[in-house]
Regions:
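Residue-level signature of catalytic and energy-coupling elements of molecular machines
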Residues: 30, 44, 80, 95, ...
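Alpha-helical transmembrane segments of integral membrane proteins
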Residues: 33-46, 132-139, 186-190
Length: 225
């Protein structure tokens, strides 16, 4: 154990003294570093693409439901459908489907709205399972690389005839630890990115539910007048 601690200290000293570049560290990490690099690229792509998609989905005219109410009360259903089609957001498409079902039982209208809402949420969540998998899998891949590197180091020590070469041991240790660092660099942003996107989607789902309730209330207004 003492020798391992000494090797770890020597590894830090060697890395600092040698001033190894990031590329050299990456290359010494082995083929698993290329896997982590690929996962990092996938993480960035999914996060940016989903962020933009959710940002677009949340854009909605603040007077949207007021205008829908005016159209419905005035009996201008076609104009209301055209307005929803023009807005082209998950909430608008949900209300548009409800407008297209007017004249049918209220339960059918509500079911149509719920079906569209479920479909829209499913679209928004596209790619999130992959992001969650990367968040959990990247650190494990990094740890696997470290374990393989340590096994290789001890095999080299064994082949050296039992003589502990601190330089060999320390060199193998810091190279092996590179994959753990790489796994965390990929996994941590993926974890926070996933939770951030999930929170944004949940907020949008709440707005969709609120607008759905408001729309169903609007449908009852003409009958009361």
């Amino acid at each position: 154990m003492i020798k391992l601690l000494q090797a770890a200290e020597l590894a830090v000293e060697n890395a600092s003294a040698g001033k190894m570049s990031h590329w050299e560290l990456f290359n010494n990490g082995g083929w698993l570093m290329w896997v982590l690099l690929l996962l990092g690229g996938v993480t960035i792509f999914i996060f940016v693409e989903r962020f933009v998609a959710i940002q677009r989905a949340q854009r909605l005219d603040m007077h949207f439901m007021n205008r829908i109410r005016d159209y419905v009360v005035a009996g201008k259903v076609k104009e209301a459908i055209a307005f929803c089609h023009h807005e082209n957001t998950p909430i608008a498409r949900m209300i548009e489907k409800g407008l297209e079902r007017l004249g049918r039982p209220m339960s059918d209208v509500q079911n149509a709205i719920e079906n569209v809402a479920n479909l829209e949420v499913s679209k928004l969540e596209n790619g999130l399972p992959t992001l969650a998998t990367i968040a959990g899998g990247a650190p494990m891949i990094g740890f696997l690389g470290t374990v393989l590197g340590m096994v290789r180091t001890f095999m080299d020590m064994s082949a050296a005839g039992g003589t502990v070469d601190m330089a060999l041991l320390s060199g193998g240790m810091y190279v092996a630890m590179v994959t753990t660092v790489g796994g965390l660099i990929v996994g941590i942003p993926a974890y926070f990115g996933y939770n951030y996107l999930v929170a944004r989607i949940e907020k949008l789902v709440f707005r969709m539910e609120a607008n759905s309730i408001a729309f169903m209330d609007i449908l009852n207004q003409p009958a009361q007048k």
